[in-house]
Regions:
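ATP-binding N-lobe of GHMP and related small-molecule kinases
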Residues: 1-119, 133-143
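Short Gly/Ser/Thr- and charged-rich N-terminal loops/segments
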Residues: 146, 150
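Beta-strand segments within the central parallel beta-sheet cores of soluble alpha/beta enzyme folds
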Residues: 107-110, 144, 155-164
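Active-site nucleophile and cofactor-binding loops and adjacent substrate-binding regions
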Residues: 121-123
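Short amphipathic alpha-helical face segments that pack within enzyme cores
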Residues: 126-134
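Short acidic-hydrophobic sequence patches enriched in Asp/Glu that either
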Residues: 87, 127, 158-162
Length: 164
């Protein structure tokens, strides 16, 4: 059986001159009962109970343009960050079946939090949520709205997305 999201993924040629900028914001959360373990590619083994910190958000902006191959730069809080960039690269490679158009784009990814880094508030899920929403937004500019892979990457990001 074919995966529903893969069957809806944009698989065509990105048009010449395709470019733009998208941005999304996703709130962080604090888990009261945390999920234990993961299955598959970052899918939670069991549910968790958490509450949303609506004033503590991760914001991601992606500038994109047509390219011969995937190329990207990642900036966190205004500074290029190769360590975070390596995690983004792994995600893009692992999930290129969901986002095949990325192999035809050059991306500049900018991410920041509305709360201090290393303050004890987890930002990995909210950052991944904002990032995935940006990718889905780029895809929607190619084919129209999608409901894509909301549980991929961190497990809880599907509960966090808020349009800026």
């Amino acid at each position: 059986m074919e995966n529903k999201w893969l069957s809806e993924a944009f698989k065509g040629e990105v048009p010449s001159g395709f470019q733009g900028k998208v941005g999304w914001q996703s709130p962080s959360n604090i888990a009261l009962v945390k999920y234990w373990g993961k299955k598959g590619k970052q899918i939670p083994q069991n549910p968790s109970i958490s509450f949303t910190l609506s004033e503590c958000c991760s914001e991601t902006f992606i500038s994109f343009e047509k390219a011969d191959r995937l190329d990207f730069r990642f900036f966190f809080e205004g500074k290029e960050n190769p360590a975070f960039g390596a995690k983004i690269e792994k995600f893009l490679l692992d999930y290129q079946a969901f986002f095949p158009f990325i192999n035809q784009l050059s991306l500049t990814i900018e991410s920041r939090n509305t709360f201090p880094h290393s303050s004890g508030i987890a930002s990995s899920a909210s950052s991944m949520s904002a990032f995935v929403m940006c990718l889905l937004d780029i895809e929607s500019k190619l084919v129209g709205p999608s409901t894509g892979s909301g549980t991929e990457g961190s497990g809880t990001e599907s509960t966090k997305a808020l349009e800026p």
